[in-house]
Curated annotation (Swiss-Prot):
EC number(s) given by UniProt: 1.1.1.23
Cofactor(s) needed by this chain: Zn(2+)
Gene Ontology MF annotations: histidinol dehydrogenase activity; NAD binding; zinc ion binding
Keywords: Amino-acid biosynthesis, Histidine biosynthesis, Metal-binding, NAD, Oxidoreductase, Zinc
Organism in which the protein naturally occurs: Staphylococcus epidermidis (strain ATCC 12228 / FDA PCI 1200)
Protein family: Belongs to the histidinol dehydrogenase family.
Function description: Catalyzes the sequential NAD-dependent oxidations of L-histidinol to L-histidinaldehyde and then to L-histidine.
Active site, per annotation: 313 (proton acceptor), 314 (proton acceptor)
Record-given protein name: Histidinol dehydrogenase
Length: 414
């Protein structure tokens, strides 16, 4: 257990992503740029031990995967899809009327989007739902999914989710090489305008490498959750909230903050007891050993200071009055309030996307939404009357900046 001061000192010294991977990733990206499909197939064999004659899956394979789902799985995926769709439709930015003003904004869906769906330690149909649904609601013309190849084929639930969300292309390629393919294009894969979706450090650095040549959502680090709890919290439930993050990967970070030292000690005992029997113990135990923090705050203000400093991907408030934290907890990817809003519900069913900022980036950026799949530009259509009202001042500013042709462009219209 750490005091707030001890934690903040230690936290500020935590290193970010492993920069040594950057050289490896840049080499992979350059190889894909030069060799196209050949490089992708070679990397599939080298990294995933899968030989792929054909990179793209047929649309019929997506439909077959959907048709083969058992009723319970189909209903769960469909319910998730519908909740996400309705929420994103509600927050989708509305076009302004050009009749109301001489200056306004117009929004258009991005033409082509690439979505990275992790394979690795688990398969994630939820990631398809939490990204492709947003692109679909935005009106994206061409939605492409890339996901690592598997010896026994791509996860059928992932393919079914692609079918539900209207994904146009699915390619069995993962890692940094898939990000390069989406950026530069290959003989088989069309280049896209924007890449979204979570992945490992190789994927994160590939996105960093290609940024500027293609749009990206974020450079994501390992998943993380920070919880503020008090004596009213169900500590068994809190333990599983911690395990739920830790089971993603050994680098997952979990933070529990409380003003009550006894509560933190009780939680620690419960976690250690359950850890002996928990599923995915190998991953969880490493995460808990290296990236799990119990933090004692002096008061609510200090608890919120810690939370806002961590700026976690997921913030959970499980106290007697969680609503009091809404305005105090500012810099988080998503805020989950109360016992019946566990972070895991946000992973699957709540409606907002689970693609969220990590690594303190919630201090300046946001979780993925339908509006991230749209471009925005200003429209300026002035009347002669308005032009005449502003021209003299604009001309003067151009003059003091010594941009004389700017000045003349205005002057000749007066």
């Amino acid at each position: 257990m750490l005091s707030a001061q001890q934690f903040l000192k230690e936290f500020n010294n935590v290193e970010s992503l492993n920069e040594s991977l950057y050289e490896i990733v840049s080499h992979i990206c350059e190889e894909v740029k030069l060799q196209g499909d050949k490089a992708l197939k070679n990397y599939n064999l080298q990294f995933d031990q899968v030989e792929t004659e054909k990179l793209e899956l047929e649309q019929s394979q997506l439909k077959n995967a959907y048709d083969m789902l058992d009723n319970e799985t189909r209903d769960a995926l469909e319910q998730s899809y519908q909740r996400i769709k309705v929420y994103q439709e509600n927050i989708k930015v509305k076009q302004e009327s050009s009749q109301q003003t001489e200056c306004y904004e117009r929004y258009h869906p991005i033409e082509r989007v690439g979505i990275y769906v992790p394979g690795g330690k688990a398969s994630y149909p939820s990631t398809v739902l939490m990204t492709a649904t947003l692109a679909q609601v935005a009106g994206v013309n061409e939605i492409t999914v890339v996901t690592p190849p598997q010896n026994n084929g791509i996860c059928q639930e992932v393919l079914a989710a692609c079918y539900i969300t209207g994904v146009h292309h699915v390619y069995q390629v993962g890692g940094a090489q898939s990000i390069a393919a989406l950026t530069y294009g290959t003989e088989t894969i069309k280049k896209v305008d924007k890449i979204v979706g979570p992945g490992n450090q190789y994927v994160a650095y590939a996105k960093k490498f290609v940024f500027g040549q293609v749009g990206i959502d974020q450079i994501a680090g390992p998943t993380e959750i920070a919880l503020i709890i008090d004596e009213s919290a169900d500590l068994d439930a809190i333990a599983y909230d911690v395990f739920a993050q830790a089971e993603h990967d050994e680098m997952a970070c979990t933070y529990v903050i409380s003003e009550n030292e006894k509560v933190l000690n009780q939680l620690n005992t419960i976690i250690q007891e359950k850890l002996q029997y928990v599923e995915r113990q190998d991953i969880i135990s490493q995460s808990i050993a290296n990236h799990h923090y119990l933090i004692l705050a002096q008061d609510t203000e200090e608890a919120c200071l810690i939370m806002n400093t961590i700026a976690p991907e997921h913030a959970s408030i499980q106290t007697r009055a969680p609503e009091m934290y809404i305005d105090k907890v500012k810099y988080v990817g998503a805020l989950f309030l109360g016992h019946f809003s566990p972070e895991v519900i946000g992973d699957y069913m709540a409606g907002p996307s689970h693609v969220l900022p990590t690594n303190q980036t919630a201090r300046f950026t946001n979780g993925l939404s339908v509006n991230d799949f749209m471009t925005r530009h200003s429209v300026i259509h002035l009347s002669q009357k308005t032009f005449n009202e502003v021209a003299e001042s604009a001309e003067h500013i151009a003059h003091i900046e010594s941009l004389f042709n700017h000045e003349k462009s205005i002057h000749v219209r007066r």
